[in-house]
Amino acid sequence: MKNTNTKLKVAITSDHAGFDLKQKIRLNLENLGFGILDLGPNNSEPVDYPDYGKAIANKIIEGDVDRGIALCGTGIGISISANRFKGVRAALCHDVKTAEQARKHNDANILAIGARHINFEDAIECVNAFLKTDFEGERHIKRIEKLDKKSLAESSINTNDTELEEALANELSRQQNTVEL
């Protein structure tokens, strides 16, 4: 496993269930010298994981960060939310091996963790493996390209532009509620 990634810029986020573990992971990474962008939340009050999954996905897509770490109670909801965006490959990992494989074979750019199902020490081992492991490329590239192509072919418009999203939603509503002669 290479350790060429100590200069990575890493986004971190969670919902309320992952807040405490997020804080511990963030501090650990800051102490190791990683650039950290904390996308919230700022406390453990109830929040909706889709909002934070979208926020971290946008940071990956926009190139503001190299990798992301996203936590919720199980890791499932936040990974599903983030994976709705083209170019995002969020992997739910629970140990070093799955974190390494997610990077080596799938070029995962977001590590999802189930905060209710892992202790701090194991979570840190997963995070370290995820951040230190490089993508192998080669035969895995064509598989990722197939995923992106399939995603485009079978999905509706994928946009991060909220004005465009709103305009499209309004037009769809207009068409559904208007009889045109």
Regions found by a protein language model. Give the residues of each.
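Glycine-rich phosphate/diphosphate-binding loop of Rossmann-like nucleotide-binding domains
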Residues: 11-31
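SAM-dependent methyltransferases
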Residues: 1-9, 30-31, 56, 149-161
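A short beta-strand-loop structural module common to alpha/beta enzyme folds
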Residues: 35-46
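Short, structured active-site "lid" loops
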Residues: 52-70, 74
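C-terminal binding/interaction regions
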Residues: 5, 11-18, 96-155
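Short active-site oxyanion
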Residues: 9-10, 65-68, 87-89
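Mid-chain, well-packed structural core segment of small domains
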Residues: 70-71, 76-116
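N-terminal glycine-rich, Lys/His-bearing helix-loop that initiates the first secondary-structure elements
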Residues: 155-181
